[in-house]
Amino acid sequence: MKETKRFFNKNNRLNKGYAKTFSINEPDNNFYRKKFEHILPPVDLISEYESIYPGTLQELMHMAQKEQAHKHAIDLKNLKIQERIAKLTRICLLIFGIGLVVLIFLKLLK
């Protein structure tokens, strides 16, 4: 286990790797995910975007529809792959079982 060493100030980047707590200097990548609980941003924020860039809401809805269609396509592809794997597994187990029965039967005849 690493020991905690403090060579410089408390939040100095040179202490990187030794700090056990969250550093204030490091960016929080989940900041916007934590800020909004839903898929779409709040209505007041959308209206501000719409006033700055007209057509933002339409583009946002179009992007959400495309992303949802892509997600469904990937899910369907994964389901087909899993179904194919299950089918091949059953076929291989059937062949193995038949081979095992044949081997046992041939040994009993000798």
From Swiss-Prot:
The chain crosses the membrane at residues 88-108. It comes from the Bacteria. GO terms for cellular component: membrane. It is a single-pass membrane protein. This is Uncharacterized protein RP532. It is found in: Membrane. The keyword Transmembrane applies. Keywords: Membrane, Transmembrane, Transmembrane helix. It comes from Rickettsia prowazekii (strain Madrid E).
